[in-house]
């Protein structure tokens, strides 16, 4: 499973996506990242593979 941290299209807020599902609405990227990493760690503890990606306009980066 891949958690994606990105900006919401309609405003300046950050969101966390997992597939087609959208979680949260964050004022800054740091809070979105913290929640995404926590969710990925929970998934790993449950025996599932998990990654966290930051998607920005010009590039993407895997951070966890």
Where do the PLM segments sit?
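Short, mixed-charge low-complexity intrinsically disordered segments
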Residues: 44-64
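Short aromatic-glycine-(Arg/Gly/Cys) micro-motifs in beta-strand/loop hairpins
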Residues: 1-22
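A short, exposed loop/beta-hairpin motif centered on an aromatic-Gly-Thr core
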Residues: 18-33
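Charged, amphipathic alpha-helical segments
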Residues: 1-2, 30-38
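Compositionally biased, intrinsically disordered low-complexity regions
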Residues: 15, 24, 58-62
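Low-complexity, intrinsically disordered/propeptide-like segments
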Residues: 6, 21, 36-37, 47
């Amino acid at each position: 499973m891949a958690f994606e941290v990105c900006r919401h299209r309609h405003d300046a807020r950050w969101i966390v996506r997992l597939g087609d599902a959208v979680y949260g609405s964050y004022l800054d990227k740091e809070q979105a990242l913290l929640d995404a990493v926590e969710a990925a760690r929970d998934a790993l503890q449950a025996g599932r593979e998990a990654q966290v990606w930051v998607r920005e306009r010009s590039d993407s980066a895997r951070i966890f």
